[in-house]
Each structure stands twice: as structure tokens, then as C-alpha cells.
Amino acid sequence: MADIAKLVEELSKLTVLEAADLAKALEEAWGVSAAAAVAVAAAPAAAAEAAEEKTEFDVILTGDGGKKIQVIKEVRAITNLGLTEAKALVEGAPKAIKEGVSKAEAEDIKKKIEEAGGTVEVK
């Protein structure tokens, strides 16, 4: 037990940088990773945060509202698609216009498409 007390005393004298270097050296010597245990423990918390507030949204065109030409023009402006691609997207509704965008951008796209006469769903 005297050896353990002596070891604790010596380790207590280490700076943070020296302790980090010690941890890396022990990981290499023993072939283990201290980060793996931390990542497993943190995973449920991260999943709970994702469920609380979604940060990426998909904008889905659900219909052209009878104003296909105006909606095609707006889809082209938003997505930088060519005329035939934008027309195929509008005619193939429901289809995603943009995926993985911020809430503000999704709401902006929704507003523009609805002003053109189309119907949009943000998921």
C-alpha cells in the first residue's frame, strides 16, 4: 500500500499537460483507449439532445397548386437545377427540394414556394 500512496503523491504533482502525456503513453503501452468508454457513455445524452431540437430539415414539395410554371421557376432559383430537372421535380411531387438545411433556410424556401402557388412540407 505504501507504493500506491507514493504513486498517488507523484501523480498529484503532474501538470495537466503531463497528465495528458501520461494517459497517451499508457494507452499506447497497454493497447487501450480511454476515449472509447467516454464516447459510449456520452452517446445516449447526444441522442436525447437530437430528439429535443432538430437542426437539419428537409423541404418537400407536395404539389404545384395548379401554378406549375411559377413553382418550376422558383424551384430552379432555389436549387440551381436546369429547366427539365426542375420540371421533373415539380411533376414528380412529393419530392425533396432541399435536404439537411437549417430551420431558417427551410422556412424561407417554404415561403417562396407557397408564394409561387406550390405546397410544401418541412420535415
From Swiss-Prot:
Full protein name: Large ribosomal subunit protein bL12
Subunit structure: Homodimer. Part of the ribosomal stalk of the 50S ribosomal subunit. Forms a multimeric L10(L12)X complex, where L10 forms an elongated spine to which 2 to 4 L12 dimers bind in a sequential fashion. Binds GTP-bound translation factors.
GO biological process: one example: translation
Pfam families listed in its UniProt record: Ribosomal_L12, Ribosomal_L12_N
Family note: Belongs to the bacterial ribosomal protein bL12 family.
Taxonomic lineage from the root: Bacteria, Pseudomonadati, Pseudomonadota, Alphaproteobacteria, Sphingomonadales
Organism, as annotated: Novosphingobium aromaticivorans (strain ATCC 700278 / DSM 12444 / CCUG 56034 / CIP 105152 / NBRC 16084 / F199)
InterPro entries hit by this protein: Ribosomal_bL12, Ribosomal_bL12_C, Ribosomal_bL12_C/ClpS-like, Ribosomal_bL12_oligo, Ribosomal_bL12_oligo_N_sf
Annotated S-S bridges: none
GO CC, alphabetical: cytoplasm; ribonucleoprotein complex; ribosome
Keyword Lipoprotein in annotation: no
Annotated PANTHER family: 39S RIBOSOMAL PROTEIN L12 (PTHR45987), LARGE RIBOSOMAL SUBUNIT PROTEIN BL12M (PTHR45987:SF4)
Molecular function via GO: mRNA binding; structural constituent of ribosome
Key words, A-Z: Ribonucleoprotein, Ribosomal protein
